[in-house]
């Protein structure tokens, strides 16, 4: 009698054979990965042989740089490791961490792409817009969007900025009656989102009044933290493994919330442009704002900009246009709160120029030099973007003779640069005189908006907004620190505080 093909014996034999083959293939794959790990590690060790570093574990890398004290640990290395040191995330992944202005000048003067290993992890969120694009596509998008930040466009934005700021300050008037301090970042983040929506995306209402936008802000905060965690987890570099993880599922949900918001912004503006009156008004404008440029864009081949490209640019600027500014403002306020003499001098300067602040224009922004010096000094101490990463497209030799081969990834630690005692004497001291007009400094010693060809396209927009916010706030409030809640700077895509930024607000009138 023949044994059925479906008999338990035949099935068990087949399963056993399959498991044996799978085990052999699994072991072979593991062996291949181990060899790749070893070879890449040896290549990195050779590439970094001219650059000493703190001790690190052969597999786990520099564990001390992965905690909440990451920024402080980098600063602590500056004295012992001049200019730069290799930072190992794990055994086969390392970056040269740079905090020297001469090194910065060399890297930012080149056309190296953004490091694909780290920045590709942002693609599901912000797509391939200006932040992630490289080469000719980046150049085309940059050239197309630059007119959105022309002075003629920025000048009338001051009124929109002031309107958004006053809404927040009115809310603070009510909160200031309480004895407790308030966490300012959430309020400021909502206000800067309101500003960028009005200025860059032709939004007619106010997101500070509509509570629906808090969901978007929460999603952005979650994505910031999730990206930071993923970059530092060896297993989460694989997209499939990450998607199956709890963090991967959270990231997918947060991305969807962020995309729903930007899709709604794009759809609303498209619907508005269906109105012939609105369309004709826009066509007659000498310069278009950010979103209208995208909607009217024609790429060099004559086709309209794809929906995918359009949303990527909107996602990118929606995030960068509000979150970095919110970080900058929050830390500026904290710096002024902890240095009341400088705060009062700024206030007196603004009062002498603006009176009660009922009217503020573009021309006023160049007439507050001391306030501008204080803003810059706060940006030095607390740069909104603590670091950026490049991947060398060709080998490079630095001014001190040390070199790196093609393919090495370089982290430009802006936080480290700004806290480097060889660049800034007594770097932890708040000293606005560093930015006095006659104060000499290296061209690449101060980089709150990066530098070179890929610097922040909206830096003039951001600086203008910072000046308006600081000026109008100091006319209405005295900022006081909460000594029981000292903020702890935290390395993320954008500089945050682990425990929030709490201030007491004292009404002046």
From Swiss-Prot:
Q: Which PROSITE patterns is this protein grouped with?
A: CYTOCHROME_P450
Query: Which cofactors, if any, are listed as required?
Result: heme
BP term (GO), one? fatty acid metabolic process
- Which chemical reaction does it catalyze? an omega-methyl-long-chain fatty acid + reduced [NADPH--hemoprotein reductase] + O2 = an omega-hydroxy-long-chain fatty acid + oxidized [NADPH--hemoprotein reductase] + H2O + H(+); dodecanoate + reduced [NADPH--hemoprotein reductase] + O2 = 12-hydroxydodecanoate + oxidized [NADPH--hemoprotein reductase] + H2O + H(+); dodecanoate + reduced [NADPH--hemoprotein reductase] + O2 = 11-hydroxydodecanoate + oxidized [NADPH--hemoprotein reductase] + H2O + H(+); tetradecanoate + reduced [NADPH--hemoprotein reductase] + O2 = 14-hydroxytetradecanoate + oxidized [NADPH--hemoprotein reductase] + H2O + H(+)
Q: What is its EC number?
A: 1.14.14.80
Q: What does this protein do?
A: A cytochrome P450 monooxygenase involved in the metabolism of fatty acids. Catalyzes predominantly the oxidation of the terminal carbon (omega-oxidation) of long-chain fatty acids. Acts as a major omega-hydroxylase for dodecanoic (lauric) acid in liver. In kidney, may play an important role in omega-hydroxylation of (5Z,8Z,11Z,14Z)-eicosatetraenoic acid (arachidonate) to 20-hydroxyeicosatetraenoic acid (20-HETE), a signaling molecule acting both as vasoconstrictive and natriuretic with overall effect on arterial blood pressure.
Q: What is this protein called?
A: Cytochrome P450 4A10
Q: What species is this protein from?
A: Mus musculus
């Amino acid at each position: 009698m023949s044994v059925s093909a479906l008999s338990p014996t035949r099935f068990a034999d087949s399963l056993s054979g399959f498991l044996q083959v799978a085990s052999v293939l699994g072991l072979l794959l593991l062996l291949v990965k181990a060899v790749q790990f070893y070879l890449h590690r040896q290549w990195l060790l050779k590439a970094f042989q001219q650059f000493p570093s703190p001790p690190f574990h052969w597999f786990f890398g520099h564990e001390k740089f992965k905690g909440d004290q990451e920024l402080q640990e980098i600063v602590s290395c500056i004295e012992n490791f001049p200019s730069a040191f290799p930072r190992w995330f794990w055994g086969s992944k390392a970056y040269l961490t740079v905090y020297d202005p001469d090194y910065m000048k060399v890297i930012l003067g080149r056309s190296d792409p953004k490091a694909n290993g780290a920045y590709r992890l942002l693609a599901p969120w912000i797509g391939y817009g200006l932040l992630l694009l490289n080469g000719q596509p980046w150049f085309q998008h940059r050239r197309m969007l630059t007119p959105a930040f022309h002075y003629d466009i920025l000048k009338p934005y001051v009124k929109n900025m002031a309107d958004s700021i006053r809404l927040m300050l009115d809310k603070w008037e009510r909160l200031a009656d309480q004895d407790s301090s308030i966490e300012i970042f959430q309020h400021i983040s909502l206000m800067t989102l309101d500003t960028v929506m009005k200025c860059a995306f032709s939004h007619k209402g106010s997101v500070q009044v509509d509570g629906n936008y808090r969901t978007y802000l929460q999603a952005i905060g979650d994505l910031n933290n999730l990206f930071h965690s993923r970059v530092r987890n060896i297993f989460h570099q694989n997209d499939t493994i990450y998607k199956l993880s709890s963090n991967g599922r959270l990231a997918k949900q947060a991305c969807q919330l962020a995309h729903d918001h930007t899709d709604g912004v794009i759809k609303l503006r498209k619907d508005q442009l269906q109105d012939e009156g609105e369309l004709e008004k826009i066509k007659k404008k000498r310069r278009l704002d950010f979103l209208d440029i995208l909607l009217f864009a024609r790429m060099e081949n004559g086709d309209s900009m794809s929906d995918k490209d359009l949303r990527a640019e909107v996602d990118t600027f929606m995030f960068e246009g509000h979150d970095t500014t919110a970080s900058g403002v929050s830390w500026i306020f904290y710096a002024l709160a902890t240095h009341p003499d400088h705060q009062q001098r700024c206030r007196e300067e603004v009062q002498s120029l603006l009176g009660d602040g009922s009217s503020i224009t573009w021309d006023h922004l160049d007439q507050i030099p001391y306030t501008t010096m204080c803003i810059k000094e706060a940006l030095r101490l607390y740069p909104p973007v603590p670091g950026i990463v490049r991947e060398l497209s060709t080998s490079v030799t630095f001014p001190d003779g040390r070199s790196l081969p093609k393919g090495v990834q370089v982290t430009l630690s802006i936080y480290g640069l700004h806290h480097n005692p060889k660049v800034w004497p007594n770097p932890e001291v708040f000293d606005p005189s560093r930015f006095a007009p006659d104060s000499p400094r290296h061209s690449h010693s101060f980089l709150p908006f990066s530098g070179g060809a890929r610097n922040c396209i909206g830096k003039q927009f951001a600086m203008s907004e910072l000046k308006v916010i600081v000026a109008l706030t100091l006319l209405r409030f005295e900022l006081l620190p909460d000594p029981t809640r000292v903020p702890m700077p935290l390395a993320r895509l954008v500089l945050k505080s682990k425990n929030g930024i709490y201030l007491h607000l004292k009404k002046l009138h």
